[in-house]
Amino acid sequence: NTVVGRRTINGRRRPRRQTRRAQRSQPVVVVQTSRATQRRPRRRRRGNNRTRGTVPTRGAGSSETFVFSKDNLAGSSSGRITFGPSLSDCPAFSNGILKAYHEYKISMVILEFVSEASSQNSGSIAYELDPHCKLNSLSSTINKFGITKPGKAAFTASYINGKEWHDVAEDQFRILYKGNGSSSIAGSFRITIKCQFHNPKYVDEEPGPSPGPSPSPQPTPQKKYRFIVYTGVPVTRIMAQSTDDAISLYDMPSQRFRYIEDENMNWTNLDSRWYSQNSLKAIPMIIVPVPQGEWTVEISMEGYQPTSSTTDPNKDKQDGLIAYNDDLSEGWNVGIYNNVEITNNKADNTLKYGHPDMELNGCHFNQGQCLERDGDLTCHIKTTGDNASFFVGRPAVQKQSKYNYAVSYGAWTDRMMEIGMIAIALDEQGSSGSAKTKRPKRVGHSMAVSTWETINLPEKENSEEIQTSQRQDFKTPPTAGGGSDMLDVEEGGLPLSVEEEIPDFVGDNPWSNITTENSQEEEAMSSKSGLTPQLKPPGLPKPQPIRRLKSFDATPDLVEAWRPDVNPGYSKADWAVATIIAGGSIKDGRSMIDKRDKAVLDGRKSWGSSLASSLTGGTLKASAKSEKLAKLTTSERARFEQIKRQQGSVRASEFLEQILAGKDPDPKFLRDR
């Protein structure tokens, strides 16, 4: 052993660092005994806390870490990731460093799922490790990631066949995956691999391409064609009282339609309004916007008009329907609304009659009423400016009572009525428009009309009167004289005044230009629509005529059919037989029958005092007192009700008779005021 004393400078100790440097500067010879296995001497860490870089031995290999991702994974995606020369998702590995060595091995892989789905989505992505590259598709769904939250899985060398060296020409392992969600984007994979490379080799530079002909011009990128679908069930609010009354219509609201483009779905609102309206019917229209370009349009329409309640507890439950007429000149069709041209229009319409023996809410389908009116339409649309749109018109909503099959209530009640199901497909790829082929009708439907003309918008008014008719059921005998039993009301539910003279119809018939002649088919298929963009749909609706109730004389037979309880206990036939047996004269028999009829008519006085008192199967009628009360002013009616509460019904009736007779009320009726 050699002992080295500590040196001092001017009596002070030399700094340790200088001492150590002095010690290292002295040469020392160390003799070691021979050993079978020599270990590399442990290098002492330098005191200056500096790190020394490790210089790899030439030809020993290297270790690298690669990070890459697999993006745009849908919830229903499936596939496999092969690790080795086939790893195309990481070119730096497969086409880069891997070509500079003879062997490699991947010692670890980390598979992370990065979620990009919303919290409302559902589903998962299962994954499976194949260490020998023998599987082509997922065979086990034990391991999986939920698409709404991130996940992570790590595999070491023993799991991924990473303990042995592999030739750079063969793959090491695979990861297979498959999702069970929707087609929307769910997220991406972030993959980290740690690789070791062994036995480097020299890679010659690839020879450059031989000179060739000048490159041809780059082709124009292929246009991405759009495909758009609108589908929905338009609705509107109506007002109805009984099946013997006409219905009233509100303004049409915006319609909520499902909008589908390139398999992506959301909701949109389409504008709707009444195309034309009069006292008998109203034709609705749905306005459809069209993006710039040329489109082949196909529309499927199923017309069915169920009505439903708007209040609890039966809200949205069907309580009847509004039937169609069988006018062959009406049907589903399209028209120009703004900045479009419509050509090659072809519309086929069908209808389905109701069976005469079928009864709904006490009414039959014995006057040509139709339950459904369907249509199929194809056309070619070209936009000519901004904000382009066309409209879909449909069979008219009939207001007359013969088409009203909604359940009867004692007062005017709001109902929701469906217009029908409409599906509109716009295909930008098609360029030839519709083919001139006749579509087969639905089973059980009658072919109504086929047309090649679009709908014209009204330009002038027409005051031609239209004769109307009311429902005649099996138990209701037809009345003589035409319109004595026609009950019509305006929108607010009140009868029109008798003095007001209003024509029955204002405006053109929008279906007047539609023809069913086959001779015009060739010309219509090859010509453009004659409509011009200057034609605009009507703005605010014009005042329309409404029919009015002039008088009502019910026959005894009609009253007895409505209310069997007014029967006096014997029929006309019973009295005729009794007269013959007693040997009476025909004059006496007729006199007694007249008395019986008077008793039946007088029975109406006990029917009640309110129009909205009860349900009577669709045949509720007002009593005589109700007709008198309707003539009172607001203040007189309030006084009548006060007298009825304080002094009784008899005094109230006396007050009513004095007011109707034009007399001043008795002072006894004013004492409590």
Curated annotation (Swiss-Prot):
- Family per record: Belongs to the luteoviruses readthrough protein family.
Q: What segments bear the compositional bias annotation Pro residues?
A: 208-220, 535-544
Keywords, A to Z? Capsid protein, Host cell junction, Host periplasm, Virion
Q: What taxonomic lineage is listed for the species of origin?
A: Viruses, Riboviria, Orthornavirae, Pisuviricota, Pisoniviricetes
Q: Where is this site: Cleavage?
A: 436-437
- Which source organism? Beet western yellows virus (isolate GB1) (BWYV)
Q: Which stretches are tagged as biased composition: Low complexity?
A: 50-59
Basic residues bias locations: 9-23, 37-49
Keyword Kinase listed? The answer is: no
Q: Where is this region: Readthrough domain (RTD)?
A: 203-669, 203-673
Region of interest called Disordered, as start-end residue ranges on this chain: 1-63, 202-222, 456-490, 503-547
This chain's protein is named: Readthrough protein P3-RTD
Single annotated GO MF: structural molecule activity
GO CC field: host cell periplasmic space; host cell plasmodesma; viral capsid
